[in-house]
Regions:
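Positively charged n-region of N-terminal signal peptides that target proteins for export
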Residues: 1-4
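Short amphipathic alpha-helices in soluble, non-transmembrane regions
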Residues: 52-55, 94-104
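Structural detector for short beta-strands of small beta-barrel domains
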Residues: 109-123
């Protein structure tokens, strides 16, 4: 009986094509409103990630509604942690990087869902978050959008962009999907 149960547990993993798992890890995460997804290199088990979760749960911009136990969720297969944040508080991106490093891992990327407005300063596009104090530098803006447009965006931030970035500073964004109008 034990062998039969073991067979049913192991069989799906043996028949899963290796490319299916690789494709899942290559797809960008899509954050929901109020979420900050932290992608980390090197997370292989939940025991290893316990210290990392604890470090991230201590950060100041966490949602006040959530406790330390429920504030950070982890998906071991993808190496992604989901944090719920208070949008009214500025995010200390460097503190995220430091917390991940203290946990013994390397920060790869951050994913966020934002609502805010576009602005153009010195020929560069900025996305200012509606509820918070965070500003993000955009490389390009889709056609049809203009200064002061209300937008909703899914952004990806590379780990190198957050090094030494303090709350309130403009954070460069690696890739972005912007739609006109706010739809939270």
């Amino acid at each position: 009986m034990k062998k039969l149960i073991l067979l049913f547990v192991v069989l799906p993993f043996l028949t899963l094509p290796p490319t299916a798992l690789a494709d899942e890890l290559d797809t960008p995460a899509v954050a929901k409103p109020g979420e900050l997804i932290v992608e980390v290199n090197g997370v292989v088990c939940s025991i290893c990630a316990k210290g990392l979760k604890k470090n991230l749960a201590k950060l100041d911009f966490q949602s006040p509604v959530l406790s330390e136990k429920s504030g950070v969720k982890i998906d071991i297969r993808s190496g992604r942690l989901v944090m719920h944040r208070d949008p009214a508080k500025p995010i200390d991106f460097d503190a995220i990087r430091v917390a991940v490093k203290k946990g013994g891992f390397e920060l790869a990327k951050l994913y966020m869902h934002l609502s805010g407005s576009l602005d153009s300063v010195d020929g560069k596009w900025l996305l200012t978050e509606k509820a918070g104090q965070n500003k993000f530098a955009l490389a390009t803006v889709p056609a049809g959008l203009a200064k002061s447009n209300a937008v909703t965006a899914h952004i990806t931030i590379n780990a190198s962009a957050v090094a030494k970035t303090k709350p309130g500073q403009i954070v460069p964004v690696e890739s972005v999907e912007i739609t006109k109008g706010v739809s939270d």
